[in-house]
UniProtKB/Swiss-Prot annotation:
Its EC number is 3.2.1.91. Residues 1-23 form the signal peptide. This is 1,4-beta-D-glucan cellobiohydrolase B. Belongs to the glycosyl hydrolase 7 (cellulase C) family. Residues 468-488 have a biased composition (Low complexity). It catalyses: Hydrolysis of (1->4)-beta-D-glucosidic linkages in cellulose and cellotetraose, releasing cellobiose from the non-reducing ends of the chains. The gene is cbhB. Its main location: secreted.
Length: 526
């Protein structure tokens, strides 16, 4: 017994040495200094507190070189297989380094504002970027979204067809997987641990080791490729948009947190079997144009993309508590002092202006889409991820797989655009080719600013973004700001609008809810 125990201890010791050697290393050629970004947390009383945050760029964009030198381990879209002979050896031999955010990646911040440039030319040409909000130098900020709302300003006026300025949440580890995977020495500080509902296989490192084995360089992306492994987790797309179209989309997974997948069993964009994985790659999307309203979002339209807009997303629960079950995802916009409720779907068979179980089920049926949303947990599955906490991602990208046509054009391109769900925007079906977009619009950019987070009704009536600066107050029965209260009939239900300048709908809330004045333009049943 004693000798067996000694052997066991020796094996453990050897294993720990091996892990220490075969690790995802950190380089020393460039100091890592995260750009600062302020944001705010708000309370139900209407007060907001500024948080001095920072952002880090994803490890996939970083210089990857030999630990003790300057030789690239990865150049263009190819690994140096003389260095990276296996996933484990590559982790031992190669290091990710610090980033020069402005000159290399076109990432700049000022106060609460973050600007991401599309094409940045330095020693190499950089395309787009993906950054994460940090709690401190080594930890991502975790957002717990149930029974809360998330608000930010965005300027998409310089984003043409084929680009996507995306704001979303994913179920990454707060430390980037550093504590869970002993071979990950870089951690969140260097942007490790990414995952999403596509189970991306284009990541150079997953779970602390490289993804070199089975790597196939892309024919269309000079910087990317696909390896044997992917990284899966739940994803909540708050905002995927350019100046033409926008969508918000929950994507649940069987397991909310980050997991490893292999080959086509990953499913999603990067695999031959799109629905073969443990996540929902399609999600349940709300795109106003796809839902039949062709005049709601775009240049000069109701939500005018020629100007910045405040985007408000609410995550409602069945019992109005932080521990309840996710029941509805609502959207509002604020522009030029006016609160704009999300557009209503024009399809009688698929009504509504928010995401609910009923909306998603009827949409899948009407559009003829495969209902993988329900298969992977639906709203309850998404709620499980929101409850565990998610990391905020802010990005700008183009699409080497479908040219972003799923967002802003007719898709599939060979389908009848008069059929429900096919038309998603006004972009031509031959638009969005990355090489063309990069050549024609190198100066494209997106600006995100004024991020706020707090209880329902707390973030967009208190000077947030381009919205009004009035204070949130509560009325016992009806809104005192609407000039049309005497002509309104019926009752507004929980969370619905019940007043505001120019409002002509119901101003009395169903019991026991009270009409709450969020600002002079908008009151809500809370």
């Amino acid at each position: 017994m004693a000798s067996s125990f000694q052997l066991y201890k020796a094996l453990l010791f050897f294993s720990s040495l091996l892990s220490a050697v075969q690790a995802q290393k950190v380089g020393t050629q460039q100091a890592e200094v995260h750009p600062g970004l302020t944001w705010q947390t708000c309370t139900s009383s209407g007060s907001c507190t500024t948080v001095n945050g920072e952002v880090t760029i994803d490890a996939n964009w970083r210089w990857l070189h030999t630990v003790n030198g300057y030789t690239n381990c990865y150049t263009g879209n190819e690994w140096d297989t003389s260095i990276c002979t296996s996933n484990e050896v590559c982790a031992e031999q190669c290091a990710v380094d610090g980033a020069n955010y402005a000159s290399t990646y076109g990432i700049t911040t000022s106060g609460s504002s973050l600007r991401l440039n599309f094409v940045t030319q330095s020693q190499q040409k950089n395309i787009g970027s993906r950054v994460y909000l940090m709690d401190d130098e080594d930890t991502y900020t975790m957002f717990y979204l149930l029974n809360k709302e998330f608000t930010f300003d965005v300027d998409v006026s310089e984003l043409p067809c084929g680009l996507n300025g995306a704001v979303y949440f994913v179920s990454m580890d707060a430390d980037g997987g550093k504590s869970r995977y002993a071979t990950n020495e870089a951690g969140a500080k260097y942007g490790t641990g990414y995952c999403d509902s596509q189970c991306p296989r284009d990541l150079k490192f997953i779970n602390g080791v490289a993804n070199v084995e089975g790597w196939e360089s892309s024919d269309t992306n000079p910087n990317g490729g696909v390896g044997n492994h992917g990284s899966c987790c739940a994803e909540m797309d708050i905002w995927e948009a350019n100046s033409i179209s926008t969508a918000f989309t929950p994507h649940p997974c069987d397991t909310p947190g980050q997991t490893l997948c292999t080959g086509d069993s990953c499913g999603g964009t990067y695999s031959n079997d799109r629905y073969g994985g443990t996540c929902d790659p399609d999600g349940c999307d709300f795109n106003s144009y796809r839902q039949g309203n062709k005049t709601f979002y775009g240049p000069g339209l109701t939500v005018d993309t020629n100007s910045p807009v405040t985007v408000v997303t609410q995550f409602l629960t069945d019992d109005n508590t932080d521990t309840g079950t996710l029941s509805e995802i609502k959207r509002f916009y604020v522009q030029n002092g006016v609160v704009i409720p999300n557009s209503e779907s024009t399809y009688p068979a698929n009504p509504g202006n928010s995401i609910t179980t009923e909306f998603c089920e009827s949409q899948k049926e009407l559009f003829g889409d495969v209902d993988v949303f329900s298969a992977h947990g639906g709203m309850a599955g998404m709620g499980a991820a929101l409850e565990q906490g998610m990391v905020l991602v802010l990005s700008l990208w183009d699409d080497n797989y479908s040219n972003m046509l799923w967002l802003d054009s007719n898709y599939p391109t060979d389908a009848d655009p008069t059929q429900p769900g096919i038309a998603r925007g006004t972009c031509p079906t031959d638009s969005g080719v990355p090489s063309e977009v990069e050549a024609q619009y190198p100066n494209a950019y997106v600006v995100y600013s004024n991020i706020k987070f707090g209880p329902i009704g707390s973030t967009f009536g208190n000077g947030g973004g381009s919205g009004p600066t009035t204070t949130v107050t509560t009325s016992t029965a009806t809104s005192t700001t609407s000039s049309a209260t005497s002509t309104a009939t019926g009752q507004a239900q929980h969370w619905e609008q019940c007043g505001g300048n120019g409002w002509t709908g119901p101003t009395v809330c169903a019991s026991p809810w009270a009409c709450t004045v969020v600002n002079s333009w908008y009151s809500q049943c809370l």
